[in-house]
């Protein structure tokens, strides 16, 4: 009988470490809701002790996600576990994930400890986590380079202490699939109480083997796979969840396991993660790349037309990619837009219908026809604009030519005040940015600029993603319009609002800290 493989998503924890700019709470929540809709069993959404912002993100997601188990990471440190539990206590169901290094190299050079001390610490911290929840995951960091006898000792002790999931990470992407399968098999042979816990794997792609290692581990008996959407993560990335999920589905004949994933949500979730994280998906990426279902060879095209199974082992529809996308026009009503969003699987609570419809009408007047990808882009940007705004683009004008110095005039609403400035620049976009810097005095430094077409032809929307440096921190901004300069201006305004919000959060945290300090003095 087919057994279920638990899908553990770490896009918002391990995956976020690869980003050039931290995600806002709203952005993290949007991804979390998409993962919930896709049906992930467990989502690891942060490392609460690392910063007040991470604590807030975990708490916000824990409060709103109902159908997936929410997990937070904690080192084998008392404070880490206590803070993780505090951030998660509002969740319907939660897990604490604690870890410690087990390889000889890590124990000697990083921890400056011994294996016996590591085991003692693991036992104590697993028991501490069990005081807060019956669902505790324990990870043996760098398990791939840990001798099997040592690993078995740690695993047995952690299970005896109360760990319900034991995670075996290939932390540096070092092992070969046959080696990794051997580690899992070896644990089943050597650990007498292993039947009391789920064996999980967490692989990295340094040698391009993350998915292969995870599947080999599943074949050897692992029943939880950890990874990130699109394989994002530090260095070469994490195991690509969409690849593992579809491999399990397509090769069920060999693996004899299944997942609880809603496969129809894979493509949409992948695209959302790509957009929000500002990490384009390579065209040749398995499952979700733009070329994954494209056939250019004449022989292949002929074969597919005769029978798709000649050259396709799965269909675009199986991951929710509908090749025929219906369009709406400026004569379409609000109900029609909502109906189309419903058909695409979006709940009204996930976007602002009034804002979406206003933006839809403006775009429809320009383009004539609005397609599914247009609606999704407008809804995505609308989500950004639901966050409090201090800066708002009121007006801009640019003048440039092949022999002229680019000049821009910009008017920004800054809170209750409206300010205007003009500036020259190295092209129209730079001129707009120079004018904005004069208005705000933020003097942000542009680190990355990318432009992506959303749609086809001359009326395609241009999405500009930028990363800017301000006071040692990096901030991400997104802008969307049919005009590239306008998209660029909106992206910079989005950055400014993110900077402003970060400053407001810092002020609020300082205010609360001062309030708590005053209360202590009163007592």
From Swiss-Prot:
Domain of life: Bacteria
UniProt cofactor(s): Mn(2+)
Locations listed in the record: Cytoplasm
EC id: 2.3.3.13
Catalysis: reaction(s): 3-methyl-2-oxobutanoate + acetyl-CoA + H2O = (2S)-2-isopropylmalate + CoA + H(+)
Family: Belongs to the alpha-IPM synthase/homocitrate synthase family. LeuA type 1 subfamily.
PANTHER family referenced in this protein's UniProt entry, alphabetically: 2-ISOPROPYLMALATE SYNTHASE 1, CHLOROPLASTIC-RELATED, HOMOCITRATE SYNTHASE-RELATED
Role description: Catalyzes the condensation of the acetyl group of acetyl-CoA with 3-methyl-2-oxobutanoate (2-ketoisovalerate) to form 3-carboxy-3-hydroxy-4-methylpentanoate (2-isopropylmalate).
Protein known as: 2-isopropylmalate synthase
């Amino acid at each position: 009988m087919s057994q279920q493989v638990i899908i553990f998503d770490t896009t918002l924890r391990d995956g976020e470490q690869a980003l050039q700019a931290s995600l806002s709470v709203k952005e993290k929540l949007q991804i979390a809701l998409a993962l919930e809709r896709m049906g992930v069993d467990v989502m690891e959404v942060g490392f609460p002790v690392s910063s007040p912002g991470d604590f807030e993100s975990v708490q916000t997601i824990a409060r709103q996600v109902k159908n997936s188990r929410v997990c937070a990471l904690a080192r084998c440190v008392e404070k880490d576990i206590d803070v993780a539990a505090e951030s998660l206590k509002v969740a319907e169901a939660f897990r604490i994930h604690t870890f410690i290094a087990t390889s000889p190299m890590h124990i000697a050079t990083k921890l400056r400890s011994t294996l016996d001390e590591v085991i003692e610490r693991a036992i104590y911290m697993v028991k501490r986590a069990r005081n807060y929840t019956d669902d505790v995951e324990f990870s043996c960091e760098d398990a791939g380079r840990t001798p099997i006898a040592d690993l078995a000792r740690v695993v047995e002790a952690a299970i005896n202490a109360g760990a319900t999931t034991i995670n075996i990470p290939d932390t540096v992407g070092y092992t070969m699939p046959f080696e990794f399968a051997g580690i899992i098999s070896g644990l089943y042979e050597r650990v007498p109480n292993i039947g009391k816990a789920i064996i999980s794997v967490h692989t990295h792609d340094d040698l391009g083997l993350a998915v292969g290692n995870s599947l080999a581990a599943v074949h050897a008996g692992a029943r939880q796979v950890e990874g990130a959407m699109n394989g994002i993560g530090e260095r070469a990335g994490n195991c690509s969840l969409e690849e593992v999920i579809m491999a399990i589905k397509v090769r069920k004949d060999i693996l004899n396991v299944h997942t609880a994933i809603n496969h129809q949500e894979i493509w949409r979730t992948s695209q959302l993660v790509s957009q929000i994280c500002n990490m384009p998906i390579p065209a040749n990426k398995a499952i979700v790349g733009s070329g994954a279902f494209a056939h250019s060879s004449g022989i292949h095209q002929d074969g597919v037309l005769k029978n798709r199974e000649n050259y396709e082992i799965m269909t675009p529809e199986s991951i929710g990619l509908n090749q025929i996308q219906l369009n709406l026009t400026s004569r379409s009503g609000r109900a029609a837009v909502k109906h189309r969003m419903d058909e695409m699987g979006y709940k009204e609570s996930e976007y602002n219908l009034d804002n979406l419809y206003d933006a839809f009408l403006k775009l429809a007047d320009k383009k004539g026809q609005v397609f599914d990808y247009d609606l999704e882009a407008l809804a995505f940007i609308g989500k950004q604009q639901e966050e409090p705004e201090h800066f708002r683009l009121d007006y801009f004008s640019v003048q440039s030519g092949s022999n002229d110095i680019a000049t821009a005039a910009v008017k920004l609403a800054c809170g209750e005040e409206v300010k205007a400035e003009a500036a020259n620049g190295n092209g129209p976009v730079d001129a707009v940015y120079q004018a904005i810097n004069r208005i705000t005095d933020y003097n942000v430094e542009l680190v990355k600029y990318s432009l992506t077409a959303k749609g086809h032809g001359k009326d395609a929307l241009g999405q500009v993603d930028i990363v800017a440096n301000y006071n040692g921190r990096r901030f991400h901004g997104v802008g969307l319009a049919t005009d590239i300069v306008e998209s660029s201006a909106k992206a910079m305004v989005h950055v400014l609002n993110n900077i402003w919000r970060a400053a407001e959060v810092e002020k609020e945290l300082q205010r609360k800290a001062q309030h708590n300090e005053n209360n202590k003095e009163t007592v």
